[in-house]
């Protein structure tokens, strides 16, 4: 644990570290996995889920090659789309409320590709995207969503095989746009926080093994796909697991620098998506 004077300095310089420490100290009211349902609310029936807001954290629900059940996996435990859900989403939303002036709904919104409802949400987050599969209609709807102003952030897939499977799905959606490696000076890293040197953000395996990578994903890849005008439409977080960092931010065993980096990146990506 950092000495208090060092913690105070980090809070003054970054702001975000204070949020991570608040998570770990319990001042956000987060007690651990499953605590969001301690009041008897299900995923989407809490009173706050009906509040009108200017921003909705939207998580993409998709069919996947590893679903335990048919279709979208429902709201049970099936479906790769729901990794870290909903705790990661809601802890990130608490940080968004604390650190920005965005009026965000405190609960997440699940969006599907089998309806046009996705067009109501300008920013969408997806995980475990090595496992996603699309019908032709779903791929076209996501294609249209991105080219009409939508922003997609993908996270939590690792290594060469995962990359190839992710790109197989992505090429159904955006077949003709190149994937680019982000540079330090790219605008998306300087919208809210100036993020210079970046490092690999590990998942929960770090707590148990000290290992930052999964599979053969040794080097973090910060990549994007842009539209014809240069706007980023897909932000790709490969060989890292930001969602786990958000989910584990309240656990003192998970190092603060990893959680702080994950929050800063997510906040910059949201601010970019909302302003471009």
Q: Which positions does each model-derived feature cover?
A:
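Aromatic-Pro/Gly-enriched surface loop or interdomain linker
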Residues: 21-123, 129-130, 241-244, 248-276
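Extracytoplasmic/secreted envelope proteins and their assembly/folding machinery
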Residues: 89-93, 139, 143, 163-167, ...
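Short alpha-beta junction capping motif
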Residues: 57, 118, 123-163
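An acidic, glycine-rich "communication" segment
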Residues: 27, 32, 37, 65-71, ...
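Positively charged n-region of N-terminal signal peptides that target proteins for export
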Residues: 1-6
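Surface-exposed patches in mature extracellular/periplasmic domains of secreted proteins
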Residues: 102-112, 154-159, 177-185
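A generic secondary-structure signal for well-formed alpha-helical elements
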Residues: 100, 150, 170-177, 273
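Bacterial N-terminal signal peptides
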Residues: 8-19
């Amino acid at each position: 644990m950092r000495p208090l004077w060092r913690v105070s300095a980090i809070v003054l310089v970054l702001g975000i570290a204070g949020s991570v420490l608040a998570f770990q100290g319990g001042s956000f009211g987060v007690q651990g996995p499953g605590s969001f349902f301690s009041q008897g609310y299900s995923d989407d029936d809490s009173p706050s889920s009906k509040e009108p807001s200017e921003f909705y954290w939207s998580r993409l629900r998709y069919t996947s090659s590893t679903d335990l059940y048919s279709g979208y996996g429902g709201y049970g435990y099936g479906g790769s789309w729901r990794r870290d859900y909903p705790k990661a989403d809601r802890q990130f939303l608490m940080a968004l409320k604390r650190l920005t002036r965005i009026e965000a709904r405190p609960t997440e919104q699940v969006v599907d590709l089998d309806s046009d409802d996705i067009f109501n949400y300008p920013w969408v987050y997806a995980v475990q995207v090595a496992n996603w599969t699309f019908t032709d209609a779903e791929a076209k709807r996501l294609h249209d969503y991105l080219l009409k102003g939508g922003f997609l952030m993908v996270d939590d897939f690792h290594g060469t095989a995962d990359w190839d499977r992710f790109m197989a799905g992505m090429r159904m959606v955006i077949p003709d746009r190149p994937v680019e490696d982000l540079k330090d000076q790219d605008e998306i890293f300087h919208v809210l926080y100036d993020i210079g040197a970046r490092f690999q953000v590990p998942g929960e395996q770090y707590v148990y093994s000290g290992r930052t990578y999964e599979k053969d994903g040794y080097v973090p890849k910060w990549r994007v796909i842009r539209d014809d005008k240069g706007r980023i439409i897909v932000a790709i977080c490969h060989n890292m697991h930001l969602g786990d960092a958000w989910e584990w931010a309240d656990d003192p065993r998970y190092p603060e620098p990893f959680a702080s980096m994950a929050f800063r990146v997510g906040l910059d990506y949201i601010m970019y998506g909302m302003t471009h």
